[in-house]
């Protein structure tokens, strides 16, 4: 079993950092089996090809732009819904992710299961730190990442449970 939890986003553009902040919270607060990798992908694109290839489950946490939904709204997309979303995105890393997913499909290395946990940003202005609206979504989004892991039979162990 090979699972990757990938957080992507630009920490210099306010809410664009949500994906990175979600995986940071996961790594800080939970212990996962060795076959589950957590990766801060930042704004990387094709450089992630090797990391994303041949995964049993790829879970991506990211900010996703939507004109239909209010800032702070969480969206969960699965499998074929994910590449479709990235075909009309605005940020450079999402174009890169679309290319990576296309390349993985072309080479036969597409993940067996793909989950996107996305949060609609309120601001993409240059600034370090999330808006309160999006920061409030770290916890619910983290719960969705944990639920996606459970779907693949992974039970995350809270770090504080180890110290009790």
From Swiss-Prot:
Keyword vocabulary terms for this entry: Aspartyl protease, Hydrolase, Metal-binding, Nickel, Protease
Chain residues that bind Ni(2+): 16, 62, 93
Listed cofactors: Ni(2+)
One of the record's GO molecular function terms: metal ion binding
Stored InterPro entries: Pept_A31_hyd_express (IPR004419), Pept_HybD-like_dom_sf (IPR023430), Peptidase_A31 (IPR000671)
Keyword rRNA-binding: no
GO biological process, one term: protein processing
EC class (word): hydrolase
Enzyme Commission number: 3.4.23.-
Family, similarity comment: Belongs to the peptidase A31 family.
Protein function: Protease involved in the C-terminal processing of HybC, the large subunit of hydrogenase 2. Specifically cleaves off a 15 amino acid peptide from the C-terminus of the precursor of HybC.
Protein name, as recorded: Hydrogenase 2 maturation protease
């Amino acid at each position: 079993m090979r699972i990757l939890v990938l957080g992507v986003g630009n920490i210099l553009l306010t809410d664009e950092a949500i994906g990175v902040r979600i995986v940071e919270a996961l790594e800080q607060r939970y212990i996962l089996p060795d076959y589950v990798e957590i990766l801060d992908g930042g704004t990387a694109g094709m450089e992630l090809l090797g990391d994303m290839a041949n995964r049993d489950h790829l879970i991506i946490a990211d900010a996703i732009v939507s004109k239909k939904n209010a800032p702070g709204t969480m969206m969960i997309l699965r499998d074929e819904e994910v590449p479709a979303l990235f075909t009309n995105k605005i940020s450079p890393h999402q174009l890169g992710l679309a290319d990576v997913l296309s390349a993985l499909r072309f080479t036969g290395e597409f993940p067996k299961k793909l989950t996107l946990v996305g949060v609609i940003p309120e601001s993409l202005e240059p600034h370090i730190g999330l808006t309160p609206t999006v920061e409030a979504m770290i916890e619910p989004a983290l719960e969705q990442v944990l639920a996606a892991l459970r779907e693949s039979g992974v039970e995350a162990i809270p770090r504080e449970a180890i110290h009790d």
